[in-house]
Amino acid sequence: MATFSQKPAEVEKKWVIIDAEGLVVGRLASIIAMRLRGKHKATFTPHVDDGDNVIVINADKVVFTGKKYSDKVYYWHTGYAGGIKERTARQIIEGRFPERVLEKAVERMVPRGPLGRRQMKNLRVYAGSNHPHEAQQPVALDVAALNKKNVRSA
């Protein structure tokens, strides 16, 4: 029996919606990255974009474990000499674009390259509970029910 290799024309993408309220960032990002890549499907092919379209709502209500909320630091460089910048997870979540914490976590779990960039375009993250994708009839994915450690008990 030959190894199965999916063709791009045979790919069937589903729409999945995830409510991120109270979910742990890293665990949620891992599940989202797996969905975006298509590794949850039996038809997974490494060089084909056969993952699902993922919508995440309430991304501003994700939680960190331990002291990461105040201690985790995100770095970037402006390109100028001495231009290293940093911001904590707390500053980002309380700032203007809190959904970037989750986007960055998922981005770092997806392979870098042309295919990874195309798969990241299938991710839509919204800080609030509203999203413009009702017409796609997304199926709800209950991440909290998959494992009790996915939810932070306060």
From Swiss-Prot:
One Pfam family assigned to this protein is: Ribosomal_L13
Instruction: Give the superkingdom in one word.
Output: Bacteria
Gene Ontology biological process terms, A to Z: negative regulation of translation; translation
GO molecular function: any one?
A: structural constituent of ribosome
Keywords for the protein's UniProt record, in alphabetical order: Ribonucleoprotein, Ribosomal protein
**Is Protein biosynthesis one of the keywords UniProt gives this record?**
no
Record-linked InterPro entries: Ribosomal_uL13 (IPR005822), Ribosomal_uL13_bac-type (IPR005823), Ribosomal_uL13_sf (IPR036899)
An example Gene Ontology CC term for this record: cytosolic large ribosomal subunit
Cited PANTHER family: LARGE RIBOSOMAL SUBUNIT PROTEIN UL13M (PTHR11545:SF2), RIBOSOMAL PROTEIN L13 (PTHR11545)
Similarity annotation: Belongs to the universal ribosomal protein uL13 family.
Q: How does it assemble?
A: Part of the 50S ribosomal subunit.
Q: Summarize the protein's role.
A: This protein is one of the early assembly proteins of the 50S ribosomal subunit, although it is not seen to bind rRNA by itself. It is important during the early stages of 50S assembly.
Put simply, this protein is called Large ribosomal subunit protein uL13
